[in-house]
């Protein structure tokens, strides 16, 4: 059975000692739930290239994108297919302008705790946020 490779990119920013995380609400035709940036790896693309493309496409950020590999990935089964998802993070400058794609209806900057406890639908997404927060606390 074929495995679909995907990426998840958690966007964050620092303002003073505070970390906030970007979450996006998918449009109702795509489920209407909150999540980080996600997307599928296209033919001949690396995970890193996909992550960069998805950041450009989904939030309109084209400059100063430095991917952070947080060392977390997961697998899941959906719609009769296996999926492998590698998680990255990107730190944005506090004043970076966000322009969401038609895939989403709104975005919010929230604390990690709020993202995990109030907004994110899927456990694997929550775990990605937890891993990133742990990673950031170690550097």
Roles of regions detected by a PLM:
Residues 11-13, 25, 91-92:
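Residue-level signal for short segments within beta-strands and strand-turn junctions
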Residues 10, 37, 89:
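Residues in well-ordered beta-strands of folded domains
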Residues 41-65, 72-125:
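Unchanged
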Residues 2, 14, 26-27, 81, ...:
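Generic structural signal for beta-strand residues in well-ordered domains
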Residues 1-21:
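Conserved N-terminal beta-strand and adjoining loop/helix that marks the start
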